[in-house]
UniProtKB/Swiss-Prot annotation:
It is found in: Cytoplasm. This is Uracil-DNA glycosylase. Its main location: cytoplasm. The gene is ung. Belongs to the uracil-DNA glycosylase (UDG) superfamily. UNG family.
Amino acid sequence: MQNAFTIDQLPLSWQEQLENEWSQPYMHKLREFLQTEYSRTTVYPAKDNIFTALKSTPFDAVRVVVLGQDPYPGEGQAHGLSFSVPHGVRLPPSLMNIFRELQTDLGIKNTTGCLQPWADQGVLLLNTVLTVRAGAPFSHAGQGWERFTDAIVTKLIENRSHVIFVLWGNAARKKCDLLFRSTHKHAILAAAHPSPLAAHRGFFGCSHFSKINYLLKKLERPMINWKLP
């Protein structure tokens, strides 16, 4: 577990931002907890994929942030990117609703659930909690991940400009409370969560994908190609 949980595996830009956070006492406790969990039970994602979001989207490359909650708890689903599943895996309901809104918004129809190409373009697909016990949603909540991902969000808010934060659901809004005091530096798009329980309460019809590209165009930055190969 030690090799899978070292700061050296992160891009240098994230290492520079998170070095102090990594050495905090709560992070040592989190590492001990994870070492026990991975040795005694099944945990998702695989150890090497815990930090896929940070590996895929270096700090200086982040243009958009999409916050999730915790990884999918089913076998073969979680691979370190919020809402995403590996190629060939059946689409979870929330991702199906995301794709439904994308098709309504921009006419783009995606059939594969791997969102890696989005991450490669600067979309940070970050969960609030980065691990989960198999079959047990939120089982790793309250162990330290929330504080660590708070630090990630805070670093982006304080040390970057013109990042587009996409907040789906109340948990994401609460996570970014600091953001609402920094609106001069960043853009905020908020809507209901795409889960089947909430999507009809404001996620469908939010047009966030076209709005993201509109904002990027205004900033004279490349737009996101939402079409997945």
